[in-house]
Amino acid sequence: LAGPVAGTYTLMTDNGFGAQNNSADTLLRLYAVRPDWKTAAGGSGTVSAVHFSTGAAQSSFNAASRITLSDPDRKLGYALQADFTHYYNNAANPLVDASIVSGRLLTGADLDTESARRDKNGNLWFGDEFGPFLVKTDASGKVLAREARLPGVVSPQSPYLGAGPATLGSSRGFEGMAVNPAGDRLYTLLEGTVTGDPARTLRINEFNVDTEAFTGAQWVYSLETAGTAIGELTAISNTEFLVIERNGATATGGGTPFKKIFKIDTTQLDANGRLVKTEVVDLMNIADPGDLNGDGSLVFTFPYVTIESVLIIDANTLLVINDNNYPGTGGRLLGVSDPTEFLRISLATPVPEPGTWALMAAGLLGLCRAARRHGA
């Protein structure tokens, strides 16, 4: 998300250590940062903390640089770690941290937040994979309403699963979510195929911010032959969106990495009623005339498993960021810890210009790396 002042950004951390059953003491947070872009003209290529509300520089990632999600008013409709004496409500486990209980802080065992957007009222919406749920908070991260559920879609981790079968695979929930320019509609993109839907198709659903309900409008996104998942959905206009599509391969294993950004338009459907896709950027083939990463090549590649953020900076510039899948390794080099990399990519064709998209050389304008870290 855009940050508090120009040149800053608001970033969301993943749910913790990669699974619901090992992340009960990981707090769900958003951080405000400022990249110092490494460009052909200079720059350190580092990312630093800023004040979450004012954008003022901070000496470290401290309490002023973040917000922590919480549910002090007990809006969510299911038991949280804060409701238990011991983690996972198991007496054999350690006691739940007192700060989690007293503040009813949300953890990586309560939600797997994968997407976040700010609405017209300044409230935040989080797309979760455990339900999957949409969760509304105020600007401080306090939950304001009961979680919203997509009818007929339930994951194996859902607290509402009961005796019925799951209709969505694990970790296949609201990976992508966009907000329209007016801030009154959200668009969720599932990462996995719902049971009974055609293979390799994903649902995009419209959500009304004012009524806090899904509208019933739905579109079908088809994965490419080489694609296995999506990473993000970002709005260009009321009908046009960017989608990150990828597979699980990296530079060190799993086959040939497939990492691309496509444009879709909800008014443009093929003969099967599925969204027409236009390739915008091949993230494995980005022009790098200044060799910003110093690898000796004039082509920059972005081979990480999960590339999960794309933000439109201006008509010709995209910000793209990967999730380092802490404690993942091997994205670029075997056995080497994966950083989170920030790319500033120049497009030859302006983003808002409808009907003129053509795959043209995308150029790397800036590069930043955030070292692997957890907590703060």
Predicted features, each with a name:
Residues 348-361:
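Short, threonine-centered small-residue motifs that mark membrane-proximal processing/anchoring sites
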Residues 128, 359, 375:
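Single conserved hydrophobic/aromatic residue that forms the stacking wall/gate
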Residues 367-376:
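C-terminal membrane-anchoring or membrane-association module
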Residues 1-350:
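Sequence/structural signature of beta-propeller domains
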Residues 360, 364-368:
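Residues within alpha-helical transmembrane segments of multi-pass membrane proteins, especially transporters
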